[in-house]
């Protein structure tokens, strides 16, 4: 990456995405907004950029109505692109997200009402 200012080239590249608000079953947000297509286009652009992206950080609201199918949809859309980028995926809940479906689908753990706090390591960078 070339520098266009006084700042040095970055040691780490982290992509932060927020408020995907996906719905289950291919439904559109408010009946008109396709939440998948822009996310898919963004993932394509990230891969095409050639950047060494160490982490994709997704902060809530991941699912608009905390539906299991919405979490599955997001995970299934993002994880193949993350694998192409060799990037760690970091999932963080928002106020629309609920602990049980989040822990089951996004973290691949048993359903839990416990806080979903995590520490991730990505290329020597600790993400809390």
Each model region followed by its residue ranges:
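N-terminal active-site segment of His-dependent metallophosphoesterases
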Residues: 1-72
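Extended active-site neighborhood of metal-dependent phosphoesterases/phosphodiesterases
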Residues: 2-6, 68, 72-128
